[in-house]
Swiss-Prot record:
Disulfide bonds: none annotated. The gene is rsmG. HAMAP family: 16SrRNA_methyltr_G (MF_00074). It comes from Rickettsia rickettsii (strain Sheila Smith). It is found in: Cytoplasm. Specifically methylates the N7 position of guanine in position 527 of 16S rRNA. It catalyses: guanosine(527) in 16S rRNA + S-adenosyl-L-methionine = N(7)-methylguanosine(527) in 16S rRNA + S-adenosyl-L-homocysteine. This is Ribosomal RNA small subunit methyltransferase G. InterPro entries: rRNA_ssu_MeTfrase_G, SAM-dependent_MTases_sf. One of its GO terms (cellular component) is cytosol. Keywords: Cytoplasm, Methyltransferase, rRNA processing, S-adenosyl-L-methionine, Transferase. It is an enzyme of class 2 (transferase). GO terms for molecular function: rRNA (guanine-N7-)-methyltransferase activity.
Length: 191
Protein backbone atom coordinates (compact mmCIF):
# COMPACT_ATOMS: atom_id res chain seq x y z
CA UNK A 1 0.00 0.00 0.00
CA UNK A 2 1.48 3.35 -1.11
CA UNK A 3 1.31 5.91 1.71
CA UNK A 4 2.73 9.44 1.37
CA UNK A 5 5.62 10.28 3.74
CA UNK A 6 3.66 13.09 5.46
CA UNK A 7 0.88 10.65 6.37
CA UNK A 8 3.38 8.03 7.60
CA UNK A 9 4.97 10.65 9.88
CA UNK A 10 1.59 11.57 11.37
CA UNK A 11 0.68 7.91 11.82
CA UNK A 12 3.98 7.36 13.66
CA UNK A 13 3.08 10.24 16.01
CA UNK A 14 -0.34 8.64 16.54
CA UNK A 15 1.32 5.27 17.25
CA UNK A 16 3.52 6.83 19.95
CA UNK A 17 0.50 8.52 21.52
CA UNK A 18 -1.46 5.25 21.66
CA UNK A 19 1.49 3.43 23.23
CA UNK A 20 1.90 6.18 25.83
CA UNK A 21 -1.79 6.23 26.79
CA UNK A 22 -2.11 2.45 26.67
CA UNK A 23 -0.10 2.26 29.90
CA UNK A 24 -2.91 3.97 31.83
CA UNK A 25 -6.07 3.08 29.90
CA UNK A 26 -6.55 -0.09 27.91
CA UNK A 27 -6.72 1.11 24.30
CA UNK A 28 -5.26 -1.96 22.57
CA UNK A 29 -4.15 -5.38 23.78
CA UNK A 30 -0.61 -5.43 25.21
CA UNK A 31 -0.02 -8.52 23.05
CA UNK A 32 -0.33 -6.38 19.90
CA UNK A 33 1.89 -3.43 20.89
CA UNK A 34 5.06 -5.01 19.45
CA UNK A 35 3.35 -5.32 16.05
CA UNK A 36 1.37 -2.07 16.23
CA UNK A 37 1.98 -0.83 12.69
CA UNK A 38 0.81 -4.05 10.99
CA UNK A 39 -1.89 -5.02 13.48
CA UNK A 40 -3.52 -1.63 14.00
CA UNK A 41 -2.33 1.09 11.59
CA UNK A 42 -2.36 -0.92 8.34
CA UNK A 43 -5.46 -2.82 9.42
CA UNK A 44 -7.29 0.52 9.71
CA UNK A 45 -5.60 2.23 6.77
CA UNK A 46 -6.60 -0.51 4.31
CA UNK A 47 -10.19 0.80 4.45
CA UNK A 48 -9.14 3.91 2.50
CA UNK A 49 -9.16 1.91 -0.75
CA UNK A 50 -12.94 1.45 -0.37
CA UNK A 51 -13.59 5.17 0.13
CA UNK A 52 -13.98 6.68 -3.34
CA UNK A 53 -14.48 10.27 -2.24
CA UNK A 54 -12.60 11.56 0.81
CA UNK A 55 -14.81 14.68 0.98
CA UNK A 56 -17.39 12.82 3.05
CA UNK A 57 -18.62 12.47 6.62
CA UNK A 58 -17.47 9.19 8.18
CA UNK A 59 -18.73 7.94 11.55
CA UNK A 60 -16.65 5.46 13.57
CA UNK A 61 -18.54 3.72 16.38
CA UNK A 62 -16.90 2.34 19.51
CA UNK A 63 -13.82 4.33 18.54
CA UNK A 64 -11.69 3.49 21.60
CA UNK A 65 -8.12 3.92 20.37
CA UNK A 66 -9.18 5.81 17.24
CA UNK A 67 -8.96 2.73 15.06
CA UNK A 68 -9.93 3.13 12.27
CA UNK A 69 -11.39 6.66 12.64
CA UNK A 70 -8.27 8.69 13.51
CA UNK A 71 -6.17 6.73 11.01
CA UNK A 72 -8.67 7.45 8.21
CA UNK A 73 -8.80 11.13 9.15
CA UNK A 74 -5.00 11.34 9.00
CA UNK A 75 -5.20 9.59 5.60
CA UNK A 76 -7.44 12.35 4.28
CA UNK A 77 -11.11 11.71 5.09
CA UNK A 78 -12.48 15.25 5.41
CA UNK A 79 -14.92 14.85 8.31
CA UNK A 80 -14.83 12.09 10.92
CA UNK A 81 -17.08 11.66 13.96
CA UNK A 82 -15.84 9.29 16.65
CA UNK A 83 -18.50 7.85 18.97
CA UNK A 84 -17.15 6.51 22.26
CA UNK A 85 -18.97 6.02 25.59
CA UNK A 86 -15.82 5.87 27.79
CA UNK A 87 -14.84 9.41 28.86
CA UNK A 88 -11.18 8.46 29.41
CA UNK A 89 -10.95 7.20 25.84
CA UNK A 90 -12.65 10.38 24.60
CA UNK A 91 -9.95 12.46 26.30
CA UNK A 92 -7.36 10.36 24.47
CA UNK A 93 -9.27 10.73 21.18
CA UNK A 94 -9.37 14.52 21.63
CA UNK A 95 -5.57 14.59 21.89
CA UNK A 96 -5.15 12.14 18.99
CA UNK A 97 -7.49 14.17 16.77
CA UNK A 98 -5.02 17.08 16.84
CA UNK A 99 -2.61 15.00 14.72
CA UNK A 100 -5.01 15.14 11.77
CA UNK A 101 -5.46 18.25 9.61
CA UNK A 102 -9.10 17.30 9.02
CA UNK A 103 -12.31 17.88 10.96
CA UNK A 104 -12.64 15.33 13.79
CA UNK A 105 -15.57 15.40 16.21
CA UNK A 106 -15.55 13.37 19.44
CA UNK A 107 -18.99 12.28 20.69
CA UNK A 108 -18.97 10.98 24.28
CA UNK A 109 -22.27 9.08 24.31
CA UNK A 110 -23.65 5.61 23.96
CA UNK A 111 -24.15 4.83 20.28
CA UNK A 112 -27.88 4.17 20.75
CA UNK A 113 -28.40 7.79 21.82
CA UNK A 114 -26.52 9.45 18.94
CA UNK A 115 -28.51 10.96 16.06
CA UNK A 116 -26.26 11.70 13.11
CA UNK A 117 -26.09 11.36 9.31
CA UNK A 118 -23.03 10.08 7.50
CA UNK A 119 -21.87 8.69 4.19
CA UNK A 120 -19.85 5.81 5.67
CA UNK A 121 -19.91 4.06 9.05
CA UNK A 122 -16.91 2.09 10.31
CA UNK A 123 -16.07 -0.02 13.32
CA UNK A 124 -13.34 -2.38 14.37
CA UNK A 125 -13.33 -4.93 17.21
CA UNK A 126 -16.73 -3.68 18.32
CA UNK A 127 -19.42 -6.37 18.14
CA UNK A 128 -21.35 -8.75 15.89
CA UNK A 129 -23.48 -7.48 13.00
CA UNK A 130 -26.84 -7.80 14.81
CA UNK A 131 -25.58 -5.74 17.74
CA UNK A 132 -24.05 -3.13 15.42
CA UNK A 133 -27.23 -2.81 13.36
CA UNK A 134 -29.46 -2.65 16.46
CA UNK A 135 -27.46 0.07 18.21
CA UNK A 136 -27.25 2.45 15.21
CA UNK A 137 -31.01 2.96 14.90
CA UNK A 138 -30.58 6.77 15.05
CA UNK A 139 -27.63 6.93 12.64
CA UNK A 140 -28.44 7.42 8.96
CA UNK A 141 -25.81 5.80 6.73
CA UNK A 142 -26.26 7.06 3.16
CA UNK A 143 -23.59 5.06 1.34
CA UNK A 144 -22.14 2.03 3.14
CA UNK A 145 -20.62 0.38 6.18
CA UNK A 146 -16.96 -0.70 6.24
CA UNK A 147 -16.63 -3.23 9.04
CA UNK A 148 -13.39 -4.96 10.01
CA UNK A 149 -14.37 -8.51 10.95
CA UNK A 150 -12.66 -11.69 12.10
CA UNK A 151 -13.04 -15.41 11.47
CA UNK A 152 -16.74 -15.53 12.48
CA UNK A 153 -17.87 -13.11 9.77
CA UNK A 154 -19.94 -15.71 7.85
CA UNK A 155 -21.86 -16.75 10.97
CA UNK A 156 -22.51 -13.07 11.70
CA UNK A 157 -23.86 -12.52 8.18
CA UNK A 158 -26.18 -15.55 8.39
CA UNK A 159 -27.51 -14.45 11.80
CA UNK A 160 -27.99 -10.84 10.70
CA UNK A 161 -29.84 -11.93 7.53
CA UNK A 162 -32.56 -13.39 9.82
CA UNK A 163 -33.48 -9.84 10.94
CA UNK A 164 -32.07 -7.49 8.33
CA UNK A 165 -32.04 -6.98 4.58
CA UNK A 166 -28.72 -5.76 3.18
CA UNK A 167 -26.27 -6.15 0.37
CA UNK A 168 -22.67 -6.97 1.11
CA UNK A 169 -19.24 -7.55 -0.37
CA UNK A 170 -16.46 -9.42 1.42
CA UNK A 171 -12.89 -8.20 0.94
CA UNK A 172 -9.78 -10.01 2.19
CA UNK A 173 -7.79 -8.12 4.82
CA UNK A 174 -4.21 -7.33 3.83
CA UNK A 175 -3.04 -7.69 7.44
CA UNK A 176 -4.57 -10.97 8.61
CA UNK A 177 -5.52 -14.19 6.82
CA UNK A 178 -8.66 -14.59 8.96
CA UNK A 179 -9.56 -10.90 8.72
CA UNK A 180 -12.20 -9.60 6.35
CA UNK A 181 -13.59 -6.22 5.43
CA UNK A 182 -17.35 -6.42 5.22
CA UNK A 183 -18.80 -3.74 2.95
CA UNK A 184 -22.52 -3.46 3.73
CA UNK A 185 -25.09 -1.38 1.86
CA UNK A 186 -28.87 -0.81 1.73
CA UNK A 187 -29.55 -1.88 5.33
CA UNK A 188 -33.23 -2.30 6.20
CA UNK A 189 -34.76 -4.00 9.23
CA UNK A 190 -37.26 -6.76 8.46
CA UNK A 191 -40.72 -6.28 9.89
Amino acid sequence: MEVPREIIEKLEIFQKLVKKWNKSINLVSDNTIHNFWQRHILDSLQLIQYIDNKEIHLVDIGSGAGLPGIVLSIAGVAQVSLIEADLRKCIFLEKASKISNNNVQIINQRIEKVEIDCSILTCRAFSNLNTIFNCIKNISVREKFLLLKGKNYLTEIVEAKERWLFGYLIHQSITCEEGKILEVSNLTKMI
